[in-house]
Amino acid sequence: MKRLLVFFTALLMFATTMSAGGKLTVRDITGSKFSAKMVQGMNPIAGTDTYARIEGKKIVSYSFKTGKQVGVLFDADNTLGKKIDGFDSYSFSPDGKRMLIQTKTERIYRRSYKAVFYIYNIASRRLDPLSDGGPQQIPTWSEDGQQVAFVRDNNIFLVKLLYDNAEIQVTKDGKFNEVINGLPDWVNEEELGFNKALTFNADGTMLCWLRYDESKVKTYSLQMYKGLAPENEEYADYPGEYSYKYPKAGHDNSVVSAWSYDIKSHKINRLQVPMDADGYMPRIKMTDDPTRIIIYTMNRHQDQLCLYSVNPRTTVAQLIIKEEVPKYVKEEAMENIRFIGNNILLPSDRSGYMNLYVYNMNGQLQRTIGGNFDITAVYGYDAKTGDVYYQAAALGATDRQIYVSHKNGKTVRLTDKEGWNTAVFSGDYQYFVNTWSDYN
């Protein structure tokens, strides 16, 4: 592991300003004058020692090793095919050869949004619309980068890049306030912290998703006014209403189920995942094994999380991990579960502290990382070495340090200054950028 390459120090200079006779204004405090200096928007490129970031209308790559620019990956003013004025965000295909360019983003709820997406080929500089049928939600790459699935109007669609971006409609029963395919309903998004319920299997031959039937959930209405952001001119004279399904305590939730679609035969099957009648399915995830996807289930009390390994072709589910905690399974624990190779990284506070438990794909515990302190972030797992990189509060509640836990059980602290350390690792785990601050 190469040592720390770039070290950013964030110090607030209030004392210096005042001792120099400077006048402290409200604008100084609320503006950027005393903001910490850091590199923002770093997006590590998988398997490399480079990262990408947005700079105006461009996406530019930089070297972790030198900090110097490597190249321009995307320039909105220099594309072939479709032309766009700008963009809001982007994501790489798993093979790094293409990008999804996100434009015209419209927020829906706290985590959900719809946008107009474009497929960009980095080598040819060609930009093509993902779909001409209207804005899309949660576009999801297949692992080979040759397919993209997305949701529109509560239905799932599939785009095949090798077939001139041919578009197939996978589901047809989606309907607002009745059935949702591939997206969580409002209460699952809000309370369980996710906005995507759709994944390919590892070889891209199957598409799997969660389906929410909210037809029996009672409706709640909100008044809408012109003054909302963005402004609604249609409500200038009279307020309107937005009605959606909102299950209050003691009332029916959506009925959730899991499904798979064979991309070659177009056959759709329901996956046989056991679940309590009033329980939840808070995640669906891909693994590196084409015969396995992982589906989470949770009881209504939310103190029991089950991980099922499901074969998307046979539809058979097998319980591999049953996680029980004294109070409730934390949202950040669910979000930080990783499936890499034959390993499952599971954060849990079952001991009273948030530690990291490493299982194999059969649910057998291999090792425990942590101690009498909380692991506060999981940065990644190097499949080549078995090293796990994480942030922890091992020195105290107001301190964060970066660590690596080796496969042999040895743990090494990678940061040497007490305070608050936050890391961004390169895709090959050879470098990381550390952002540091303290209260002085």
Language-model segments: residues:
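A short helix->beta-strand "capping" segment at the edge of beta-propeller domains
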Residues: 21-37, 263-272
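Non-catalytic accessory segments flanking enzyme active sites
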Residues: 39-43, 50-61, 71-73, 88, ...
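Short loop/turn segments that connect beta-strands within beta-propeller blades
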Residues: 64-67, 121-125, 161-164, 262-266, ...
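Predominantly five- to eight-bladed beta-propeller fold
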Residues: 32, 104-109, 113-116, 166-198, ...
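Blade-terminus and WD-like Trp-Asp/Gly-His loop motifs, strongest in beta-propeller folds
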Residues: 42-49, 90-98, 138-147, 151, ...
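Short glycine-/Asp-/Thr-/Trp-enriched loop segments that recur within the blades
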Residues: 33-38, 79-86, 177-193, 276-281, ...
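Blade-loop segments of beta-propeller domains
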Residues: 68-106, 127-137, 324-327
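Structural motif
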Residues: 57-62, 109-116, 153-159, 216-222, ...
